[in-house]
């Protein structure tokens, strides 16, 4: 889902940050080729940060955004001050690859409703789905990609399958918090544990949440903000 035209929704979701921060939310560029990779996304964000004349940023990355954030901190250590990595991994793995491969197949075959259903069941925990009966209806309303957007989705999904920077994690200099979810079906919590151990940083695991931990946990943004405001 693209972020253009969603300023009000995003401002509401990130309202806790607005008194302390100027918040920038990045989308991928309009035209991407089939070889588009995480490293390309990192270069684009670094370019934007420099063009905005920003010296230092605190970066919060969720899922694929967490992959981008890791590599940004590695390749541009002078830019990143603090880093929050949410429901993400430093390398592909059989569980994640199986989930993403399934999404790609459904997208390639234009099975949008089945893709929506599978994503809801995989991204959110069963408990959260049970408590929020409106979730599937909301996703059907908001997630209505055109065929060219499905092609885009496939390219972005495939970029995760090729991602592996585990051996570079010791280059991260930024103060880092890793947030994982015990019920994550997309990126198992063991990879959050692995990430925190390799970086040698703080870790927080939410025991009752799924991959969409940033949506499921009511005080998630406050937790992140407290870390970002904490003194070194």
Where are the regions a protein language model picked out?
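Conserved HGGG/HGGXW glycine-rich cap/lid loop of the alpha/beta-hydrolase fold
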Residues: 1-32
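Conserved acidic catalytic loop of the alpha/beta-hydrolase fold
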Residues: 40-57
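Gly/Ala-rich beta-loop-alpha elbow adjacent to hydrolase catalytic centers
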Residues: 61-65, 69
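Flexible "cap/lid" loop of the alpha/beta hydrolase fold
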Residues: 74, 81-111
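Conserved alpha/beta-hydrolase catalytic His-Asp/Glu region
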Residues: 94-97, 114-161, 166-168
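Short beta-strand/loop motif that positions the catalytic acidic residue
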Residues: 172, 178-180, 184
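Conserved alpha/beta-hydrolase "acid-adjacent" motif
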Residues: 185-191
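Catalytic histidine-centered segment of alpha/beta-hydrolase-like enzymes
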Residues: 209-221
């Amino acid at each position: 889902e693209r972020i253009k035209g969603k300023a009000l929704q995003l401002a509401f979701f990130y309202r806790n940050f607005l008194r302390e921060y100027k918040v920038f939310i990045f989308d991928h560029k309009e035209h991407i080729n089939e070889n588009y990779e995480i490293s390309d996304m990192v270069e684009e964000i670094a370019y934007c940060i420099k063009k905005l004349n920003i010296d230092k940023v605190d970066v919060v990355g969720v899922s694929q955004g967490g992959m981008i954030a890791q590599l940004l901190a590695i390749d541009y250590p002078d830019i990143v001050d603090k880093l929050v990595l949410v429901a993400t991994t430093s390398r592909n793995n059989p569980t994640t690859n199986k989930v993403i491969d399934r999404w790609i197949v459904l997208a390639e075959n234009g099975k949008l409703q089945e893709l929506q259903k599978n994503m809801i069941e995989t991204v959110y925990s069963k408990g959260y789905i049970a408590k929020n009966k409106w979730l599937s209806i909301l996703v059907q309303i908001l997630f209505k990609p055109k065929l060219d957007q499905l092609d885009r989705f496939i390219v972005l999904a495939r970029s995760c399958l090729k991602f592996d920077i585990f051996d570079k994690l010791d280059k991260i200099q930024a103060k880092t918090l890793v947030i994982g979810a015990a019920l994550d079906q997309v990126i198992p919590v063991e990879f959050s544990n692995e990430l925190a151990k390799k970086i040698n940083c703080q870790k927080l695991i939410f025991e009752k949440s799924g991959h969409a931990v940033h949506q499921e946990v009511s005080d998630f943004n406050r937790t992140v903000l407290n870390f970002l405001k904490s003194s070194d």
